Regions:
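A short catalytic or substrate-binding loop motif that flags glycine-/basic-rich loops and adjacent residues
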Residues: 17-18, 151-152, 347-353
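Hydrophobic h-region of N-terminal signal peptides that target proteins for export
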Residues: 10-19
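Substrate-recognition/cap regions that form aromatic- and gly/pro-loop-enriched pockets
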Residues: 323-356
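Short, well-ordered beta-strand elements within core beta-sheets of diverse protein domains
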Residues: 125-131
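A contiguous strand-loop segment
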Residues: 21-121, 141-296
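Short, charged, surface-exposed loops that flank catalytic or proteolytic processing sites
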Residues: 131-137
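Positively charged n-region of N-terminal signal peptides that target proteins for export
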Residues: 2-6
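Mid-to-C-terminal functional-domain signal that highlights helix-capping/loop sites
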Residues: 288, 292, 298, 302-308, ...
Length: 356
């Protein structure tokens, strides 16, 4: 087992009522053993308490693949099966391609109202793993499939990695007025780390960097046609156009990314106004990736996924809800109202309802 070539897929953990997933990506030159790491926490009280196996197989011409929504179990249709599919266990295949995700939702008018015929995000990940030998190939498989058959989910951030490269692919549909999806994929530099946690993280991207950036041809023109963007092409921000920030997206989602970065690099204090939810549109945008001050071990990454904002302005062990024992955990729901006043709990990376 060559650990320096192994893509380490850590914990797969999803939540129902609140933003609920966290991914941390580590480039191969940012890790101690030369591996790309992906973490995947999903907090759903057991909704995802199983690991699926898709055996490798050869398929005769004319074989059809049934598409069933991975969340609702609703049949969506059929697509032609690939001539050969690879062995997949959970979120990683025999070629060490791994795909995980967090749902950012985005603009509701772009969500599918009647998704019959499209491909949902769970099926899309499985198809990418069954049909690709590299991360780049998986991104092409996934984006080609939604272009041809449609996309049947809300906005998603996908982590797509192999032993050599780690990418973030962000995608959202076009609503009922058009088939397909708009998307952008950015490669994380080998010596950097990145993360996403239920909010779109790709803002501006280099339109000319074909080696490290991929995007739908109409990602900017579609945004213009919907009135989401009016500037120059090089000013375009995927996140601003398709998932505008609000208090929840910053305090409950981007703050988790901030806290992960804060474990491994310096200078994150200046992004507190970006993630505290009080300075929407007026604070400096947190970068998509940062360079860590040290090489990360598997144990370092596992420890970071146990984060409760300790020793930060959002520390859950020190607020009024922590009780006499300084507990970081809170009962659901995330937000509530009492006597006409709204309250909320912090949403850390580590939470008691993690499924696996």
């Amino acid at each position: 087992w060559q650990m320096n070539r192994l893509l380490a897929l850590l914990a797969v953990l999803f939540a129902l009522a609140a933003p609920a997933c966290t991914n941390l990506l580590v480039g191969k030159k940012a890790s101690k053993n030369g591996a790309c790491f992906i973490t995947y926490s999903a907090d759903s009280y057991g909704m995802y308490g199983r690991m699926l196996h898709y055996p490798a197989g050869k398929h005769a011409p004319g074989t059809m693949r049934k598409i069933v929504d991975g969340d609702t179990h609703k049949p969506l249709g059929e697509i032609p099966e690939a001539p050969y599919t690879y062995n997949v266990v959970g979120n990683i295949n025999e070629h060490q391609v791994a795909i995980t995700e967090t749902t950012f939702g985005g603009r509701e008018e772009l969500w599918p109202k009647n998704p019959v015929g499209g491909i949902d995000y769970v099926s899309l990940m499985a198809l990418g793993l069954q049909r690709a030998k590299t991360a780049r190939e998986a991104i092409r498989v996934m984006t080609d499939l939604v272009a041809r058959y449609g996309y049947a989910s809300e906005g998603e951030s996908f982590s797509v990695a192999d032993p050599n490269e780690a990418w973030i692919l962000e995608m959202i549909g076009k609503g009922d007025s058009a088939k397909g999806a708009v998307w952008v994929a950015v490669r994380i530099p080998d010596d950097c780390i990145s993360a996403h946690a239920n909010q779109s993280r790709i803002h501006r991207f280099n339109l000319k960097d074909k080696k490290n950036v991929m995007y739908a041809r109409d990602v900017i023109s579609f945004a213009r046609s919907k009135g989401y963007f009016k500037g120059r092409d090089d000013e375009f921000s995927f996140s601003d156009a398709f998932a505008p920030a609000d208090f929840s997206s910053q305090r409950f989602c981007e703050a988790r990314v901030w806290s992960l970065f804060n474990h491994f690099t310096t200078g994150m204090d200046k992004y507190v106004p970006f993630v505290d939810g009080k300075h929407i549109g007026t604070s400096e945008v947190m970068p998509l990736y940062v360079k860590p001050t040290q090489l990360l071990s598997l144990e370092d990454v596992m420890s970071a996924m146990r984060d409760h904002y300790e020793n930060t302005p959002f520390d859950g062990t020190k607020d009024a809800g922590s009780g006499v024992w300084g507990a970081p955990y809170r009962p659901s729901p995330l937000t509530w109202e009492h006597e006409g006043k709204k309250y909320f709990n912090e949403r850390p990376v580590s939470t008691h309802q993690a499924s696996f």
